[in-house]
Each structure stands twice: as structure tokens, then as C-alpha cells.
Amino acid sequence: MSRALICSLALLAMLVISGTYASPAANAEALAAANAEASAAANAEPLAAANAEPLAAANAEPLAAANADPIAAANAEPSAAANAEPLAAANAEPSAGPSPLAAAQDPPVVKMKG
């Protein structure tokens, strides 16, 4: 045997013993497993995000609207009515009768007999 062949076989034996060299079948299996895990993770995360966001939005908006509307309506309606009616009454009542300023400026006319 030639010296180069013996060195090559010795090097190959050392690599196999140390575990650095693996057969092509073992390499292919490891690559397939690594690719499958990476593909599953890469596909699962975007799918989970794509499904979760529309569901969260679809559930949150009607709940928020259903909870907010009655509260806002319950608070706004009495306040509007409570504020509008006294203001309207306060504005309408003084203008219904004679102005106190007009009465103070125009003293009553007194006719003298004689």
C-alpha cells in the first residue's frame, strides 16, 4: 500500500473514532430533522399570530362597544337633561316679565290735580 493511502485511512479512522465524521445517511437524517423543526417553528409562529390578532380584535371591539355604550348613554342622558332644563328655565323666566332695569329708569308718571 502506498504511504498516502495509509495516511488517508488512518485519518479517516481517527475522524470516525472521534465522532467528527458521520456517514452521508446520518448527515442527511440530521439535516432533515433540523430542517423540519425550523420549518415547523417558522410556520407555526406566523400562523398563530395571524389567527390571534383578528380573533382578539373581533372579540374586543364588540365587547368594548357593548360595555361602553350603556355607560356613556346612562351618564350622558341625565346630565344633558339636568343641565338643559334649568338653563332654559333660568333664561326664559326673566324675559317673561318687565325688566327690573326698565322699571328703575322710567319712574311712574304722577299727575297733579289742580
UniProtKB/Swiss-Prot annotation:
Which cellular compartments is it found in?
Secreted
UniProt propeptide residues = 23-104
Any one annotated GO CC term: extracellular region
Q: Which domain of life is it from?
A: Eukaryota
In which broad location class does this protein mainly occur, judging by the first location in its UniProt entry?
A: secreted
Query: Residue positions of the PTM Lysine amide?
Result: 113
Instruction: Give residue numbers for the modification (Pyrrolidone carboxylic acid).
Output: 105
Task: Please verify whether the record's keywords include rRNA processing.
Answer: no
Q: Where are the sequence repeats?
A: 22-29, 30-37, 38-45, 46-53, 54-61, 62-69, 70-77, 78-85, 86-93
**Start and end residues of each stretch annotated as Disordered:** 82-114
Q: Where is the signal peptide?
A: 1-22
Q: Where are the stretches annotated 9 X 8 AA approximate tandem repeats of [AP]-[ILS]-[AP]-A-A-N-A-[DE]?
A: 22-93
Extra information? Is a minor component of A.samariensis venom.
Write the protein's name. Answer: As-peptide 126
**What species is this protein from?**
Anoplius samariensis (Solitary wasp)
